[in-house]
């Protein structure tokens, strides 16, 4: 069977169980696709030997009849996850050559479930970015192009390599992480599905930290069913992460009935921003109409503190980043600068960080250090934390009033061209996160579902936000939206 790499997780799982294909065949198809897609710069560390060894082991396990759902399925791993003996550098020069001695909990769970790791995926450096342009590996490039235009487009960020790889059928699915929208925005830009689960649902242990109170891992897949299958394998309690919650993990796939009759879907009026492109507003209205036609009740809701979310996020996230990134000092691991005669420890720190950190990371570390400094701690950091509490309360009030899920746009536009925002004020790039950061600040689950295309043929996504710990219900609502939207567009192969 040709084109095995074009399958989704559920389809491939069913073929494996029937004996119609093998994990080795699936893996070889993906490895061939990866080797033919260097122009996308999605896979930055290829691990064909690891992949084929795991595929052979998975085939043996399937033959014995004790295989979990993910067994034998080839996936990509975002470079933010530590993978034992395999380069894990968070797309930063400061971690060049770093091969961890341990495996992150999420990647270990996937490995234990029999998933096959094809390699590590490009991303924004330390997950700081919305376009995959801050990577030490160079830009990841979207497989999508505007109709009649060869301008290379961003796959989004920070999980840009994951989104590009899934959209281009280089793997069946991929892991991502989401601190302010880094799963959902790239998914929307590439016509894929991305879910950020409730904060604490997936362990953060072994994931290189950006902002510890916001970071959360999740799957990036070709459809909602695949997201349900992969999320179940990724989450679960981990004693090594103090924020990991000890809750039973439901069978998310079994909850996908598509029945949303009587569900209350909230439409937040504050998300209708000035200058919102007509295409995004129209898509949002169409999405609400689709859910209504499926039997849901659409209600107008208010999230009054929404306008403060972006500034609060861009105080809290850099503050936590400046603390987390203090560990990269050239002493224990990663890059160490060459020192001049007479240089001491201070010069080693300065030179190592100047050489190792890219501009955006340096900017965020500086902002974070500033807002945590003695004179500004109360004015910025403490105030942002108070705003965060109010944003969380807004959502709690809406859910307490009986709303089951909230529908919003995922992004303020379709994918933009690489370099298009480079000369701009960085705040313009930060505005890409305007619809997604509230979900991280409130610790809620959010999913991006491809729902349509713009006038130039580029994919557009809508976001659904769910109650905490209710990913099953959220996935089912997303499944109903996916069925109604009937999105099947794929990028035309140019690479």
Curated annotation (Swiss-Prot):
Keywords: ATP-binding, Ligase, Nucleotide-binding, Protein biosynthesis. Pfam families: Amidase (PF01425). It comes from the Bacteria. One of its GO terms (molecular function) is ATP binding. Its EC number is 6.3.5.7. The keyword Protein biosynthesis applies. The active site is at residues 78, 158, 182. It catalyses: L-glutamyl-tRNA(Gln) + L-glutamine + ATP + H2O = L-glutaminyl-tRNA(Gln) + L-glutamate + ADP + phosphate + H(+). It is an enzyme of class 6 (ligase). GO terms for cellular component: glutamyl-tRNA(Gln) amidotransferase complex. GO terms for biological process: translation. Allows the formation of correctly charged Gln-tRNA(Gln) through the transamidation of misacylated Glu-tRNA(Gln) in organisms which lack glutaminyl-tRNA synthetase. The reaction takes place in the presence of glutamine and ATP through an activated gamma-phospho-Glu-tRNA(Gln). HAMAP family: GatA. PANTHER family: GLUTAMYL-TRNA(GLN) AMIDOTRANSFERASE SUBUNIT A (PTHR11895:SF151), TRANSAMIDASE (PTHR11895). NCBIfam families: gatA. Heterotrimer of A, B and C subunits. Belongs to the amidase family. GatA subfamily. This is Glutamyl-tRNA(Gln) amidotransferase subunit A. It comes from Ruegeria sp. (strain TM1040) (Silicibacter sp.).
